Amino acid sequence: SPAKPTMHPGSRTTSYIMKGVTNAHSNFEKAQRVNHWYTIAGIDVYTMKNNLSAIAIIGNSITDGRGTTDNAQNRWPDIMSEMLHLKHKITNQGVLNLGIGSNQVVVPGGIGTLAKDRYDRDILGQCGVKKVIIFEGVNDIGNTKSGNSETTARLLIESYQNMIKKAKARKLKVYLATITPFKGAGYYTYFHEACRQYVNDWIRSQ
């Protein structure tokens, strides 16, 4: 367990809290139900097989599961994992979801440690990772003042470059996703859209 108590408020999965010792045969009818996770920082699966690997995803609420159904496990990484297993018969790769709702890459604010600072721990520090998906940046743009959009674009690109460099140094394959459209959001302006397009143009050029 982690040194400090932790929680995942956006787990979209029910936890059952009871006093005393419980097991799979316990009656949970009187348990307190909350749609959060607590305490556990991570789970490793030990195996004697040597052909297993993982795909680690760093992202924000889009990856964390904002808008999905509680207990349905229908976040896009869940669906991706299911498609790999069922449709493509790839059963030796796991998908690790390291998304944090309201997380940001470089612009201070939001929830959790900035992606550029948690990348080593949350992505490179995971066991068995062979592929990395970077899908984050929209919150940085949305929380940038219009006059600072060029600076945010530059800092995002620099952070992406650094993440990619670190992954390639470990011989990991990297997929960098473009930033999704956000027209209609309260922070949408011409300047924010121009910033998104600039960053996406750079991503597509790589």
What is each PLM-predicted segment?
Residues S1-I58, T63-N71, H88:
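N-terminal secretory targeting modules
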Residues K89-V107:
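Short connector loops at secondary-structure junctions
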Residues S61, M83, L98-G101, K166:
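Generic, well-ordered alpha-helical scaffold segments in large soluble proteins
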Residues N51, T91, R170:
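Residue-level signal for beta-strand positions within conserved beta-sheet cores that form or flank
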Residues N71, D78, E82, L86-H88, ...:
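Alpha-helical cap/lid subdomain in secreted, periplasmic
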Residues S15, D64, Q104-V106, G142:
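Basic, gly/Ser/Thr/Pro-rich low-complexity segments located predominantly at protein N termini
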Residues A54-G59, T63, Q93-G99, K130-E136, ...:
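Structural recognition of the beta-strand scaffold that forms the well-ordered cores
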